[in-house]
Amino acid sequence: MTGYFSFPFPRRTSVGVDVGGVAVGGGAPVVVQSMTNTDTADIDQTVAQVAALHRAGSEIVRITVDRDESAAAVPRIHERLQRLGINVPLVGDFHYIGHKLLADHPACAEALAKYRINPGNVGFKDKKDRQFTDIVEMAIKHDKPVRIGVNWGSLDQELLTRLMDDNQDKGFPLTAQEVTREAIVQSAILSAEMAEEIGLGRDKIILSAKVSGVQDLIAVYTELATRSDHALHLGLTEAGMGSKGIVASSAAMGILLQQGIGDTIRISLTPEPNGDRTREVQVAQELLQTMGFRQFVPIVAACPGCGRTTSTVFQELAQNIQADLRKNMPVWREKYPGVENLKVAVMGCIVNGPGESKHADIGISLPGTGETPTAPVFVDGKKAATLRGTSIAADFEKMVTDYIEQRFGRGGKAAAE
C-alpha cells in the first residue's frame, strides 16, 4: 500500500466499505478517485483513459453509464483492463435510467465495483421511490456498494420546496442558502435510510453532497458528518479550470480533511481542450501529501528563487527531477518499496541551500549569482560530493537514481530495515 502518515487529530469514525478490494472509510487511508470523460461506448478510448488514470495513481475510477451502448461496453472494458493487469475498481455513474440499464445489462451490473445513485434524478414523482428501490435491489443482488451522491445542481426539488415552505412558517426563518444546505444534507441521509430499509447493509453505503461553493461545501459536509457515520466522498463540483479549480478544491477539502472529515476524494477540474485528464489525480495526491496524510511520490523541495538566483538551472533541474520521479513511480512502487518517502532538495544559492539539502535524503545546493561555480551534494545529511562544470544537472540526476537503487533496491538499506 502507498505510504501514509497518521492524522495529527482524531479522524471521524465511519463505517468501512469495500469497493472492489479498496477499503474506503473505517479508518483506511483517504482514497484518491477520478472520472473519465470519454464516451464509455468507445471501448478503446475508455480503456486507454482508465489505464492512464490508474497509472497516475487513481485508486477508483468512475465511468459514465448513460445508455444501452455504454452499459454493454462496461464488461468488455473491465475484461480489457484485467488483461492489461489493471485491477482498478470501476464505478458506474447512473442518472435517470440507471434502474433500467442495470436490469437490462446484468453483465454491466456485475463488472462494476460500485454504483453511483443521484437521488435528485433517479426518478420523479411516483416513480422516484420505485426506481431508487430497483437500483438498490440490484446492488444487493450483485453484492455491490453504492454511493448516494447528492449534487445541488440536480437537488430533489420536492424536498427543497417542502423545506422552503416549512421555513416560511418559522418565526425566525433561515436564509434560502441555509435551507438549500439543509435540503442537501437531508437528501443524503433520507436516501441512505431508505436504502437500509430496502436491505442494503450500512457497510455498502457511501455518501457525498457536492456543491460548487467553498463555504457551502464546508458547511454541508460538517453538518453531514455530525448526523451520519457513513463513509464520505469529498468533491467540489464545477470547481473550474486551472489554478482556480485547484485552489478552490484544495481550500474546501483541506479544511474538511484537517477536521478528520472525508474518506475518499476527487478533484473535479475542468480540463483544458485536449488537456491531460490525469492532472486531477496528481492534484488530489499532492493535496493529501502536502497535508501529511499520505505519501505517493518523492518530495522535491526547491527554493522559490530571488535576486541571488538569476540562473534558471536550479528551476530546470527541480522540474526535470520531479517529472522523472513521477513518470517512474508506476514501476518504482513495485521495484523500490518505500521510495515514495524519499525527499530530494534542489536549491539555488548558498543562503538556504546547504541547510535544506542536509535535511533531505539527497540534495544539491547550486551556485547563485556571483558564487563559485560549484555545487555541493549532501546525502543522508552529509556532504558526499562537489559537482562542477556544465554537466552538474546530469551528474546530480544520476546520483539521485543511484541513491534510489542503493537505498530502496533489493538488498538496499531500506529493504533491510
Swiss-Prot record:
<comment type="pathway">
    <text>Isoprenoid biosynthesis; isopentenyl diphosphate biosynthesis via DXP pathway; isopentenyl diphosphate from 1-deoxy-D-xylulose 5-phosphate: step 5/6.</text>
</comment>
<dbReference type="InterPro" id="IPR011005">
    <property type="entry name" value="Dihydropteroate_synth-like_sf"/>
</dbReference>
<feature type="binding site">
    <location>
        <position position="349"/>
    </location>
    <ligand>
        <name>[4Fe-4S] cluster</name>
    </ligand>
</feature>
<keyword id="KW-0560">Oxidoreductase</keyword>
<keyword id="KW-0411">Iron-sulfur</keyword>
<dbReference type="GO" id="GO:0019288">
    <property type="term" value="P:isopentenyl diphosphate biosynthetic process, methylerythritol 4-phosphate pathway"/>
</dbReference>
<dbReference type="InterPro" id="IPR045854">
    <property type="entry name" value="NO2/SO3_Rdtase_4Fe4S_sf"/>
</dbReference>
<dbReference type="GO" id="GO:0051539">
    <property type="term" value="F:4 iron, 4 sulfur cluster binding"/>
</dbReference>
<dbReference type="Pfam" id="PF04551">
    <property type="entry name" value="GcpE"/>
</dbReference>
<keyword id="KW-0004">4Fe-4S</keyword>
<feature type="binding site">
    <location>
        <position position="356"/>
    </location>
    <ligand>
        <name>[4Fe-4S] cluster</name>
    </ligand>
</feature>
<protein>
    <recommendedName>
        <fullName>4-hydroxy-3-methylbut-2-en-1-yl diphosphate synthase (flavodoxin)</fullName>
        <ecNumber>1.17.7.3</ecNumber>
    </recommendedName>
</protein>
<dbReference type="GO" id="GO:0016114">
    <property type="term" value="P:terpenoid biosynthetic process"/>
</dbReference>
<comment type="function">
    <text>Converts 2C-methyl-D-erythritol 2,4-cyclodiphosphate (ME-2,4cPP) into 1-hydroxy-2-methyl-2-(E)-butenyl 4-diphosphate.</text>
</comment>
<dbReference type="GO" id="GO:0046429">
    <property type="term" value="F:4-hydroxy-3-methylbut-2-en-1-yl diphosphate synthase activity (ferredoxin)"/>
</dbReference>
<dbReference type="InterPro" id="IPR004588">
    <property type="entry name" value="IspG_bac-typ"/>
</dbReference>
<keyword id="KW-0414">Isoprene biosynthesis</keyword>
<dbReference type="GO" id="GO:0141197">
    <property type="term" value="F:4-hydroxy-3-methylbut-2-enyl-diphosphate synthase activity (flavodoxin)"/>
</dbReference>
<feature type="binding site">
    <location>
        <position position="306"/>
    </location>
    <ligand>
        <name>[4Fe-4S] cluster</name>
    </ligand>
</feature>
<keyword id="KW-0479">Metal-binding</keyword>
<feature type="binding site">
    <location>
        <position position="303"/>
    </location>
    <ligand>
        <name>[4Fe-4S] cluster</name>
    </ligand>
</feature>
<dbReference type="InterPro" id="IPR016425">
    <property type="entry name" value="IspG_bac"/>
</dbReference>
<dbReference type="GO" id="GO:0005506">
    <property type="term" value="F:iron ion binding"/>
</dbReference>
<comment type="similarity">
    <text>Belongs to the IspG family.</text>
</comment>
<keyword id="KW-0408">Iron</keyword>
